């Protein structure tokens, strides 16, 4: 694996994992509201 490729992919992977984390958190919050009502 080329080090330059890792340097380029690193921020993309971090942004993708951050987006997935935020979407997951939002979904859990929505399900929590639905269950409470």
Curated annotation (Swiss-Prot):
<dbReference type="GO" id="GO:0015979">
    <property type="term" value="P:photosynthesis"/>
</dbReference>
<dbReference type="Pfam" id="PF06298">
    <property type="entry name" value="PsbY"/>
</dbReference>
<keyword id="KW-0602">Photosynthesis</keyword>
<dbReference type="InterPro" id="IPR009388">
    <property type="entry name" value="PSII_PsbY"/>
</dbReference>
<keyword id="KW-0472">Membrane</keyword>
<keyword id="KW-0793">Thylakoid</keyword>
<keyword id="KW-0604">Photosystem II</keyword>
<feature type="topological domain" description="Lumenal">
    <location>
        <begin position="1"/>
        <end position="4"/>
    </location>
</feature>
<keyword id="KW-1133">Transmembrane helix</keyword>
<dbReference type="GO" id="GO:0009523">
    <property type="term" value="C:photosystem II"/>
</dbReference>
<dbReference type="GO" id="GO:0009535">
    <property type="term" value="C:chloroplast thylakoid membrane"/>
</dbReference>
<dbReference type="GO" id="GO:0030145">
    <property type="term" value="F:manganese ion binding"/>
</dbReference>
<comment type="function">
    <text>Loosely associated component of the core of photosystem II (PSII), it is not always seen in crystals. PSII is a light-driven water plastoquinone oxidoreductase, using light energy to abstract electrons from H(2)O, generating a proton gradient subsequently used for ATP formation.</text>
</comment>
<feature type="transmembrane region" description="Helical">
    <location>
        <begin position="5"/>
        <end position="23"/>
    </location>
</feature>
<feature type="topological domain" description="Stromal">
    <location>
        <begin position="24"/>
        <end position="37"/>
    </location>
</feature>
<keyword id="KW-0812">Transmembrane</keyword>
<keyword id="KW-0934">Plastid</keyword>
<comment type="similarity">
    <text>Belongs to the PsbY family.</text>
</comment>
<comment type="subunit">
    <text>PSII is composed of 1 copy each of membrane proteins PsbA, PsbB, PsbC, PsbD, PsbE, PsbF, PsbH, PsbI, PsbJ, PsbK, PsbL, PsbM, PsbT, PsbY, PsbZ, Psb30/Ycf12, at least 3 peripheral proteins of the oxygen-evolving complex and a large number of cofactors. It forms dimeric complexes.</text>
</comment>
<keyword id="KW-0150">Chloroplast</keyword>
<protein>
    <recommendedName>
        <fullName>Photosystem II reaction center protein Y</fullName>
    </recommendedName>
</protein>
């Amino acid at each position: 694996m080329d080090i330059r490729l890792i340097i380029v992919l690193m921020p993309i992977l971090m942004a993708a994992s951050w987006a997935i984390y935020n979407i997951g958190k939002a979904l859990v919050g929505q399900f929590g509201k639905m269950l409470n009502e």
